[in-house]
Amino acid sequence: MKWGRTPAPVSSAVDSGERILAWSTLRGRPEGTYVIATDAALYVVDTNPLRLPWDCVTKATWTDDAILVVEARPNRQAPDQVWHLSPEDLQRLPTVVYERVTSNVVVSEKVALEGDLGIRIVARRSGDDMRWTVTFDPGLNAEDPDLRRRAEEALADLRSTLGL
């Protein structure tokens, strides 16, 4: 994030009405590629532009060598996808990304299904609604009908308990 005027390619890449909070060019990418954090979404602007609303981002972490690893579920039925981004400027981006991802989480609950293995149920604000995601631990077969049934029951129980 540079101080001063936001470059036109950055401003024009975001949806109308969104406020740009932080941005950076990306290391090792052609000129004109950016990562942009707005009040509503994370953008990756390159040859194949991407907009990830914050309620779709399931996890965002930083590696020791300043690579932003974003896990997101852009489609409610799809599994998480992972993007590795190398911003050149880290002044505000790490703080903004952390704040935006965590501020959308309303509830996060771990439910055991088999021993220590289970699911993580997360509700995130999505406009006026809630976006619920259920993520199976590695080692559990998410296609197993019995496990899916138990996961759906756990989700229904949690929603009922919370009145959501």
Question: Would you name each region that the model predicts?
Answer:
Residues M1-L164:
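Eukaryotic intrinsically disordered, low-complexity regulatory linkers and tails enriched in Ser/Thr/Pro
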